[in-house]
């Protein structure tokens, strides 16, 4: 199975810079829409704790990940018109701030390398997902998905609740 390590050191630098400007949120053991591109498409979201799912229109599951996670890091540079929702899958804490402010702060604090590293990691994760799914039969796709779930924490793996 292909695996790529989340760039936690770079996340830490970005979080340290951005956190003092963000609006905090916390959800306790509930599924909640954290981000919806039709409501707050011009914000950067930083997830500090919890598990989140990324969904496309009609509730199509794109992926599930554990904190820490940053969504919308590049939205201050390039508008994204694809309808996405980020949903908490239980306890979740984090913050959000305007994407343009995120870019300004990255520029002021010379964190382009860290931002690039984070975005490169996200791109690689999506690339690996595509490699596992595109051009493979259903058995191979299910097998690849189950193998990727090995890296999830026990709480996430044991969840049997269906998504909204």
Predicted regions and their residues:
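A small-molecule sensor/coupling module
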Residues: 101-141
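Cyclic nucleotide-binding regulatory module and flanking cytosolic helices
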Residues: 1-33, 41, 69-70, 75-76
């Amino acid at each position: 199975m292909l695996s790529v390590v989340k760039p936690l050191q770079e996340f830490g630098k970005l979080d340290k810079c951005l956190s003092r400007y963000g609006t905090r949120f916390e959800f306790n053991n509930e599924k909640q829409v954290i981000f919806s591109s039709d409501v707050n498409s011009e914000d950067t979201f930083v997830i500090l704790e919890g598990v989140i799912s990324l969904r496309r229109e009609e509730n199509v599951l794109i992926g599930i990940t554990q904190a820490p996670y940053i969504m919308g890091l590049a939205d201050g540079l390039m508008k994204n018109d694809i309808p996405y929702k980020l949903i908490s899958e239980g306890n979740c804490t984090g913050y959000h701030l305007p994407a343009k402010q995120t870019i300004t702060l990255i520029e002021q604090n010379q964190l382009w390398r860290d931002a690039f590293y984070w975005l490169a990691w996200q791109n690689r994760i999506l690339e690996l997902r595509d490699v596992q799914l595109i051009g493979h039969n259903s058995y191979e796709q299910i097998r690849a998905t189950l193998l990727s779930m090995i890296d999830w924490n026990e709480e996430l793996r044991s969840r049997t609740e269906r998504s909204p």
